[in-house]
Amino acid sequence: MNIIAIMGPHGVFYKDEPIKELESALVAQGFQIIWPQNSVDLLKFIEHNPRICGVIFDWDEYSLDLCSDINQLNEYLPLYAFINTHSTMDVSVQDMRMALWFFEYALGQAEDIAIRMRQYTDEYLDNITPPFTKALFTYVKERKYTFCTPGHMGGTAYQKSPVGCLFYDFFGGNTLKADVSISVTELGSLLDHTGPHLEAEEYIARTFGAEQSYIVTNGTSTSNKIVGMYAAPSGSTLLIDRNCHKSLAHLLMMNDVVPVWLKPTRNALGILGGIPRREFTRDSIEEKVAATTQAQWPVHAVITNSTYDGLLYNTDWIKQTLDVPSIHFDSAWVPYTHFHPIYQGKSGMSGERVAGKVIFETQSTHKMLAALSQASLIHIKGEYDEEAFNEAFMMHTTTSPSYPIVASVETAAAMLRGNPGKRLINRSVERALHFRKEVQRLREESDGWFFDIWQPPQVDEAECWPVAPGEQWHGFNDADADHMFLDPVKVTILTPGMDEQGNMSEEGIPAALVAKFLDERGIVVEKTGPYNLLFLFSIGIDKTKAMGLLRGLTEFKRSYDLNLRIKNMLPDLYAEDPDFYRNMRIQDLAQGIHKLIRKHDLPGLMLRAFDTLPEMIMTPHQAWQRQIKGEVETIALEQLVGRVSANMILPYPPGVPLLMPGEMLTKESRTVLDFLLMLCSVGQHYPGFETDIHGAKQDEDGVYRVRVLKMAG
């Protein structure tokens, strides 16, 4: 952070000579100087180079207009205006709130001015650095001797071993020096919420529009459990999204509560839909409670917002309508919704308090923002028992939290403040929109087939597109008005083979083939469905990566149309079973898997599997207690009907539980098993395409086995 831009030269001695002296003095202070050609060049440079820490310009030539333009990009950036005795100073009180300083053109003053600019630069860096991160930086710079944990002592221990030196050189000194003990009192305590840790949480709450925020250093899986342990006491009833993350299924196993399920929709493509409006009504909840053994009126509700595939709820409507005192929005995938107007009313923290309710929102800061893995946040709006909540927080929080993770969460929040933050999110949205348009253009210009995108026919402007009733593109037959919206940064690519209504064509290209092709070229897909691939356009996606993905898709089309051999097109897949793939070509493989999917009627099978819920024989908590007592046995997956599952069973993708602990498949829900067996059959026919099924293990003979509770007697 040492770059200063100077606008000039001006072609007159009394201006250029003082600036020339100043340049030399600034270089002596450690600054790097650049000379933009004009204001357009300067603004482009600031937009794409956040390391710039100041701008020097002539007031007569640029005045407030340039200041206003720069403020739109970064209102904190120091601006240095040079004036002469005849300059007109038309500056209002509002204008003086800018980081704007004035200097006169004068020879012999360069060193003093450079020292002041160094001071203003230090103030700028201090101003944009959040409190805990600032304190951590200061502590590391002090290089204190410690006789406490961690044992590597700021990386010193690593340098006493050859392999340790490799580790130290890879991660770097500052990373290891910042890994400090909770014994460092000047950094406060994450568990007690004191000192810079408390300042960080208050800073984050203000940034995200929450009344209170908590930093969690071991993932939103833990954040979800913290909220649940506080909000759903033993013996209570919990209203929960069936599309929930497995961490919430684990919560149900830990906590002795009765789950009542909110049943979401999905379309023929396998894309996860939202929970219909009718499910949130009091009449619907009363029916569910009456049909569930031991259930009472729920004290807490959990809703996944957004869905994995990027569908956001009208959260304002849910908060007003859902008649429970506590609502938790699991927003792991959308920590950015507070920072762009298109997401207004679609996040847990949007809007004001709701009388008589407390709203929780958990976010995986690391998923779509610039934070280290496991960085997570809990936001709260409404009245709650802080002491009781903190007990739940401490119950799940290590007494040795990672301070680099804490600093990364806080820095992620700092990056979103002010105009720089708005621009950061807007750039992500615009880049995703541009990518969508490019795929559409290539599809229109392509000879024969090309990929499509799951979106409305017209996407001219950035917005959250409504999943409106009566429209064909989304494939949800009973969509509600003003209820669900597609996030533009969650891009789902469609491959040939099936349309949004589930109609299958004679030929198709299963998405798993495209995912393997891209993976072998260094492009990792977030999620793969039967004929769709999900890509996340986070703030870290730049034009180079977006163009690389486009190039990968066009290369796949070219290779597919040439009908290359598997050996040449997918060498890693070929290595899985060279004998099987020896003479096979890509079109043969694609049509083979496609025919297998058609044979089993995958679209219909998938819809039926998720539509009919298994029978709950006991709660997940009760089933877990049986399992840890050893009252379980292992059976083949084919024998699952009529047995009570000991574990949750979920295929990935989509990563949504099909069967919970304590649930049993019956004749009515037999299609769940048929769907699982169909997924297994693809891997049995084609090596390298085995399905990852959580809760089922494949033995050496290729048989999938699951754990069930022992039958009585």
From Swiss-Prot:
Inducing factors: By RpoS-dependent mechanism on stationary phase on the contrary to the second lysine decarboxylase CadA which is not induced by RpoS.
Activity dependence on pH, as recorded: Optimum pH is 6.2-8.0.
Reaction(s) catalysed by this chain's protein: L-lysine + H(+) = cadaverine + CO2
Principal EC category: lyase
Entry keyword set: Decarboxylase, Lyase, Pyridoxal phosphate
Record EC number: 4.1.1.18
Any single biological process term in GO: lysine catabolic process
Cofactor(s) the record lists: pyridoxal 5'-phosphate
Keyword Lyase: yes
Cited InterPro entries: OKR_de-COase_N, Orn/lys/arg_de-COase, Orn/Lys/Arg_deCO2ase_major_dom, Prn/Lys/Arg_de-COase_C, Prn/Lys/Arg_de-COase_C_sf, PyrdxlP-dep_Trfase, PyrdxlP-dep_Trfase_major, PyrdxlP-dep_Trfase_small
Membrane-spanning residues: none
GO cellular component: cytoplasm
Residue positions where N6-(pyridoxal phosphate)lysine is found in the record: 367
Function statement: Plays a role in lysine utilization by acting as a lysine decarboxylase.
Protein name: Constitutive lysine decarboxylase
Organism: Escherichia coli (strain K12)
